[in-house]
Amino acid sequence: MVAVDSTFPSHGSSYSSRRKKVSALEPNYFGSMCMGVYSDDVSISAREVAQDYSCDSCGDLATVSSACCNFDELCGLDSALEMGCRSNEDCRAGQEASGSGIASGLDKSVPGYTMYASGWMYGNQQGQMCGPYTQQQLYDGLSTNFLPEDLLVYPIINGYTANSVPLKYFKQFPDHVATGFAYLQNGIISVAPSVTSFPPSSSNATVHQDEIQTEHATSATHLISHQTMPPQTSSNGSVLDQLTLNHEESNMLASFLSLGNEHACWFLVDGEGRNHGPHSILELFSWQQHGYVSDAALIRDGENKLRPITLASLIGVWRVKCGDANCDEPVTGVNFISEVSEELSVHLQSGIMKIARRALLDEIISSVISDFLKAKKSDEHLKSYPPTSAVESISSRVINAEKSVVSNTESAGCKNTMNEGGHSSIAAESSKYTKSVGSIENFQTSCSAVCRTLHHHCMQIMWNAVFYDTVATHSSCWRKNKIWFRSSDISTVNYCKGSHTKYSDKPESFESFTCRVDSSSSKTAYSDEFDLATNGARVRGLSSDTYGTESVIASISEHVENELFLSLKTHLTDYTSILIKDGANNTTSSARDGKMHEGSFREQYNLEGSSKKKNGLNVVPAKLRFSNDFSDSQRLLQEGESSEQITSEDIIANIFSTALETSDIPVNDELDALAIHEPPPPGCESNINMPCLRYKYQPVRSKESIPEIKAYVSMALCRQKLHNDVMRDWKSLFLKCYLNEFLASLKGSHQVSRKETLALKKRKTVTRNKKLVQSNISNQTAEKLRKPCVGASEKVLVKRSKKLSDSHSMKEVLKVDTPSIDLSVRKPSQQKMRNTDRRDHCIIKDATKLHKEKVGKDAFSKVICDKSQDLEMEDEFDDALLITRLRRISRNKTKELRECRNAAKSCEEISVTAEESEETVDCKDHEESLSNKPSQKVKKAHTSKLKRKNLSDARDEGTKSCNGAVKSFTEISGKEGDTESLGLAISDKVSHQNLSKRRKSKIALFLFPGFENTSRKCFTKLLSPEDAAKNGQDMSNPTGNPPRLAEGKKFVEKSACSISQKGRKSSQSSILKRKHQLDEKISNVPSRRRLSLSSTDSEDAVIKEDYDVRNEEKLPCHTSDKLQKGPNKLIRRRKPLAKHTTERSPIKDLSVDDGRPKPIALKPLEKLSSKPSKKKLFLSIPKSDGCARTSINGWHWHAWSLKASAEERARVRGSSCVHMQHFGSKSSLTQNVLSARTNRAKLRNLLAAADGADVLKMSQLKARKKHLRFQQSKIHDWGLVALEPIEAEDFVIEYVGELIRSSISEIRERQYEKMGIGSSYLFRLDDGYVLDATKRGGIARFINHSCEPNCYTKIISVEGKKKIFIYAKRHIDAGEEISYNYKFPLEDDKIPCNCGAPNVYCFCEQVPWIAKLKRRTWFSRRN
């Protein structure tokens, strides 16, 4: 603990100033108190008065307050420890060794004279007395083991040192610390002046100390001689010379005491007769117990009814009256309060002192830096010396500066006993170098001045503030073993005065020395007075030898520099980076300029090696370091003068570089020969090499001191941080790239797969058509060989077939897609018939396309010729007769075919019906082939004219061969596009032997095209079971069952008659029924025919049945193929047929009335609409479309209501009950089930019809409300989340609030906006009323806005009151947030959108041009 450079009076005054309390006493007597010595402004009379009552300098009545002041607690001592006794033989021995006299006349038996210790001192290793210290400082040193327990301390009582006691008594007898342990000694307390505490060292005291001690002696003598001794008391506490109290006074005294222990009615009377108070009896008793007031003190009552009595008498009467038990209990409470208050004050004082020290240190450092900057400015105008001379002069100055600084510090910190001459020379030398700060000549001298100034100020006050925090964990054991229990053994190395040219002679600039740590001047003492005297003699011998004294001071200074570095290293870490940077720059510049002297490094290395061998340490001399530092600084200063770029930061770094680099000097700690088991403090181990900071940076905290778990935790945190950074960068870098590649590859694969599929289908179709063409050619060749004699008409047909087979268009016409059919498995007869059916179908479609090209009558005739030609090629000779008859029938109907519209409809219906018999027909390619070759169409039309004549001839021949079997053939009206347009009649007398099975199939095909399989199976049923089994194997066998063939003929005749009967109707009625008949023929199939329908036909029938009839009029011939190619698209757009939908046969009754068959009763099926109906939208109304706020200007609503129609007004006022914008939901397009809302509506209607009551009540609405939860929203702030699944169109919650008028809503809106609430909870019902849910509303007001909401609002009138209900717009899953659309036209620019949905309605108020662009884009998409 470093001593503070102050005398007794100043120290006591500063300490008493913080303990002073407010009192009613006059300031001239008690205004300035101290611990041990009175101030000069206090008179002798006042001191005598104070001694009468407190008997010491601190017993002033001014220090007494209403809260009892325990002096033991003031010093921070533990009063709970037990007291003990010890002999004071050591104290007597110390008293004899000190040689101080014993003053008489101060007997302990005198009760009025109480002794108090105002300060404490102890002797150091050099025999010097250090102090005075307060009791708290000694107690802190003892508790932290900084001071040993056996250290002898001397109390200062009334300005004089008393007998010494061990420091451990502070813990053993805490109650006697305030009295200086005077009452523990049986002898007389010796109060002697401390003029010379130790005779050997008295000659070295300063003149100032002699004057102070002389003054103290005079004051003590005056106090002893003029002391007024109070009257003595006996052992029972009664006053000897005091009169006994009479009965009246006793009663009056008892009455005063009966007022209470806390009643303040007693005054203390001083020597001059003045009263001080009032005080309570408890306060007086407490002061008496702690010795603050003597028993002989006079006490006077407040009313002055009693004469003054002594305190002992008053306490005795009080004890008798209230009893010991009752008195001790309140005293304990008061004592506890006083202890707590004093403890708090002590802690507060220590905190204030620490802050004051730090503030003082900051002020010192700032003043030093400012002085240095001023010196630097003045130094810039001076011319620097050469580096060689500067090194020599500065090296010598540094040594002298170190000596002067250390000596000056020792003289200021302690009461040094050296002679006056040595002190004055050191002071003169110190003042000489202090002047150099004001008149600095170069940069190096300023550095030495700064270091000296730092030493001078920091050595006094920085130990507790800096060093103690750094070495507190290891200082206890180390100082106990190395400082307090060993003798000083200062080993020094004399400076060599040899030549400076030889480094082997150890010149002064390279001298190194070692020192012992126990040479510190501020922390040494001995266990007894004999050691102190011996050390005093040793120090006196060292002071006689000047050279030895200088070496001791130099060693101490060097050690202090090392400790200063250890403390600065922890507090000046900010400058380490600057130093490292400067060192690196210096080394780099030196290497670049070639100024590194190789010999100097070699010599330095040799020197370090030799010193290491001697001391076992890597020691670098301090003077050498100073020289190098100053030379580098000189070089930097010269560069700075030329460039003028030296900043204050670089200067400060260079200032501390010298102090920091002195840490390279290690401390050679030689431990005791005794067995010491305590570990040495860090940095003081033996044989440790300390590298220079110039080449290597030393961290403040070593790596070994870091716990292993902290290292693992740090590594884990670093890895986690690195992982997060890498993952974030990876996602942003690769995710987008991979997504683009995936989309590009997906798109490309779709395109490639589509192209490959189309190419594969086209390739298969071409191959199949080639095979069909080849087979047809072979069949035609065989027919020619079998029928050499053919009529003219047959020759024309053969020529036509050749042209069709040779032309390229035949390949396109015959492109047929037949999936799931293997042609190789069929028999030749089956294959031939299949090909014939396909060609027939393609020819009919060809006729339809030609009619679209306005070929007209010729084109249709051509189609008939082509069909007849193909039939004649493939059938046998007897089939030609049937074909001729068919041509004759078509010839009779050429007049009706001239009507283009009817013919077009006929062809379209033929094509639609023919598609059902085929698996897949590629009409698109056929259409392209026809459009690419118009010349072929013209040729075909020309050929059809030539064939028409032949048809007439063939008709005459066919009529004759029929033998008049059919007298009146029914005519086929041109309105039908089915097989009726190619109407035929078969004679009942046609021999069934001449009809082959193939011909029967042909007849069925012409009668019911599209039902090829059905007709074939129907005829198969008419045959015998054996023939039915052979139907798929041998179709050329003419045998059959005659009865069943007859039945088949009758069925064909009846069908033909019924069809011809319809032809007799007018063309007008046929046109009206055309649409219904088309749908009926596709969908309504007789039961016997529906059994034979294939899966493909059924699918096509369903598609065509659901197709819109209105589009059927404009449907081209190739549209059915498109529908057949993409059935999935149509199925997705249309609802499937209901399960309960039934099909009815179109033929109700075939009976004949009046010789004429009745028309077929047709009943169309009820079909679902293929397209959803479009609802009417009202967009011109300035309403809040579900928005939870109102318009700023209500006149918009008023202006609109004046112009609006009655219908719109009624709708807004709630007559329509709902907002039209939210009618329906998307789920209605994909679901065919009744929603829960519909079921409830039906139930309400039933109940209302049954009971006649209004069932729509609020209780039902509350029961229907869904379970929602109020929680944090992902959209904005707070929101509502569904806790259960909610179906579409279900009621969710009601928007509840306060119903106000529009004018009031505008006022509230402005108020809400000023308050920061906003107007998002105002919901407009109509142009007159607004629903305000800001302060009085339900949780529905927290539903957030979304541009893609899942709910919508409805305004419904319930019992004449409009209410706002929120319904689900779509299916809402559990956990999904409820939202609806706030937006409406008037306030798009006022409400910001936070939903973040990728919707064009999500406008942004900060960027208006983006909103316009989005709106324009959206409207363009709609158009």
UniProtKB/Swiss-Prot annotation:
Q: Biased-composition ranges for Basic and acidic residues?
A: 950-959, 1115-1124, 1140-1157
Q: Which residues fall in a compositionally biased region of kind Basic residues?
A: 936-949
Q: What is its EC number?
A: 2.1.1.354, 2.1.1.357
CC terms in the record's Gene Ontology section:
cytoplasm; nucleus; Set1C/COMPASS complex
Tissue expression from the record: Expressed in the shoot and root apices, vascular tissues and mesophyll cells of rosette leaves.
Polar residues biased stretches: 1057-1071
Task: Name any one Pfam family assigned in the record.
Answer: SET
Q: What is its main location?
A: nucleus
Identify the residues that the record assigns to the SET domain, covering every copy.
1266-1383
Keywords from the named record: Chromatin regulator, Flowering, Methyltransferase, Nucleus, S-adenosyl-L-methionine, Transcription, Transcription regulation, Transferase
Q: Does the keyword Hydrolase apply?
A: no
Provide the GO MF annotations for this entry. histone H3K36 dimethyltransferase activity; histone H3K4 methyltransferase activity; histone H3K4 trimethyltransferase activity
**Region Disordered: which residues?**
923-960, 1057-1097, 1115-1158
Family membership: Belongs to the class V-like SAM-binding methyltransferase superfamily. Histone-lysine methyltransferase family. TRX/MLL subfamily.
Q: What is this protein called?
A: Histone-lysine N-methyltransferase ATXR7
Q: What is the lineage of its organism?
A: Eukaryota, Viridiplantae, Streptophyta, Embryophyta, Tracheophyta
Q: Which gene encodes it?
A: ATXR7
